[in-house]
Amino acid sequence: AACAVAERSLPEREVHAAIHDGLLVLLDSLATEDWPTVYIKWELGLLKEIGYGLDLSECAATGAKDDLVWVSPRTGRAVSRAAGEAYRDKLLTLPAFLLTPGGVGGEEEIAAGLKLTGYFLERNLFAPHGASLPAARQRLGERLRAISAV
């Protein structure tokens, strides 16, 4: 899935050392149970590297740095529980592990993380070119969501 996303989102012959290094970390993590967390963080890094990074540092509405639980699909910025409660149905879930250095996601958080990165990859990279997420990435999301539903 990572190779398919990288191939479809990065210009050919353009060097992106951070993406390459992150991919090596991801490949090393495949032998561990935490690889889905590493994968989601890799996708966040890819978005940042190509100019579509999410701002998860503070609430877009209030500037608060605590209790960040959603991301605005319009701005890609974090939203606190207090500021976003009235709009919760329109916001994307922000998995807590993305806010904690070294944090690892549980099954539901992994599903939410894949939905979050998938949304921004689709909207910013693929849809403008009449494309969708690569099939391998779609299958990865479906399989991990199925595991979290069990």
Predicted regions and their residues:
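Non-catalytic alpha-helical scaffolds and adjoining flexible linkers that form interface surfaces
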Residues: A1-V150
